[in-house]
Amino acid sequence: MRKSLCCLLLVTSFLGCGLSVNALERPTASQYDARVMYTDYKPGQVYPIRAANGLITTITFSPGEKIRDFGSGYSTAWEFQARGNNFFLKPKDFDGATNLVIVTDKHTYLFDVHPGSRAKATYSLTFRSVSY
């Protein structure tokens, strides 16, 4: 019985470790409004964006960082526009969940974008100035 319990705990701990590998790291919400988010760039990190019909989400990169290119898996479901170090997106299709890749002159950013409710929408995601 004791040996079985130890094996079960060992297997469970290994399974738990595997589950966290693909976990999204959530950006930090503003102390004033949870729809305004801040984060640091981390290579290989996927950043979640929750957008809402009729609302624009702004992604702001470090000052001086220039957007070179972008693409998504379901681009017809979204409106995209890049200006300076800002990137704007707005859903056109309520079922338009996809990934988004934005390449700047400094980094490649990976996003998981989903349309959803206004209450959970990301109005703004700002990347703080951090060098890697």
Residue spans of the language-model regions?
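Bacterial N-terminal signal peptides
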Residues: 8-17
